[in-house]
Amino acid sequence: MDFKRVKEYFAWLYYQYQIITCCAVMEPWEQSMLNTIILTIVAMVVYTAYVFIPIHIRLAWEFFSKICGYDSSISN
């Protein structure tokens, strides 16, 4: 895939984003506010997943290992 196709693909994705969020009909300050809100929400979701998913995986591993009889737990 050459650079031109990648650039066109990202342009298409950005166009789809504008259509889905109705950014095409907003004023520039409204677009920046909406983009800021969306970026903030995405950043919070990524941070929360980064912090809490490993903890939940470890707890689930310990829970199911006790149920299945595998008594060795992950040491901290």
UniProtKB/Swiss-Prot annotation:
Expression is strong in hypogonadal (hpg) mouse prostate, weak in mature castrated mouse prostate and absent in normal intact or androgen-replaced hpg mouse prostates. The keyword Disulfide bond does not apply. It is found in: Endoplasmic reticulum membrane. Coiled coil: none annotated. It holds the Pfam family SPT_ssu-like. The chain crosses the membrane at residues 12-29, 37-57. InterPro entries: Ser_palmitoyltrfase_ssu-like. Residues 30-36 are lumenal. The keyword Nucleotide-binding does not apply. Keywords: Endoplasmic reticulum, Lipid metabolism, Membrane, Sphingolipid metabolism, Transmembrane, Transmembrane helix. It is a multi-pass membrane protein. Pathway: Lipid metabolism; sphingolipid metabolism. GO terms for molecular function: serine C-palmitoyltransferase activity. GO terms for biological process: ceramide biosynthetic process; endoplasmic reticulum organization; sphingolipid biosynthetic process; sphingosine biosynthetic process. Residues 1-11, 58-76 are cytoplasmic. It comes from the Eukaryota. Induction: While expression is androgen independent in the hpg mouse prostate, it appears to be androgen-dependent in the kidney and brain of normal intact mouse suggesting tissue specific regulation by androgens. GO terms for cellular component: endoplasmic reticulum membrane; serine palmitoyltransferase complex. PANTHER family: SERINE PALMITOYLTRANSFERASE SMALL SUBUNIT B. Belongs to the SPTSS family. SPTSSB subfamily. Component of the serine palmitoyltransferase (SPT) complex, which is composed of SPTLC1, SPTLC2 or SPTLC3 and SPTSSA or SPTSSB. The heterodimer consisting of SPTLC1 and SPTLC2/SPTLC3 forms the catalytic core of the enzyme, while SPTSSA or SPTSSB subunits determine substrate specificity. SPT also interacts with ORMDL proteins, especially ORMDL3, which negatively regulate SPT activity in the presence of ceramides. Component of the serine palmitoyltransferase multisubunit enzyme (SPT) that catalyzes the initial and rate-limiting step in sphingolipid biosynthesis by condensing L-serine and activated acyl-CoA (most commonly palmitoyl-CoA) to form long-chain bases. The SPT complex is composed of SPTLC1, SPTLC2 or SPTLC3 and SPTSSA or SPTSSB. Within this complex, the heterodimer consisting of SPTLC1 and SPTLC2/SPTLC3 forms the catalytic core. Within the SPT complex, SPTSSB stimulates the catalytic activity and plays a role in substrate specificity. This is Serine palmitoyltransferase small subunit B. It comes from Mus musculus (Mouse). The lineage of its organism: Eukaryota, Metazoa, Chordata, Craniata, Vertebrata.
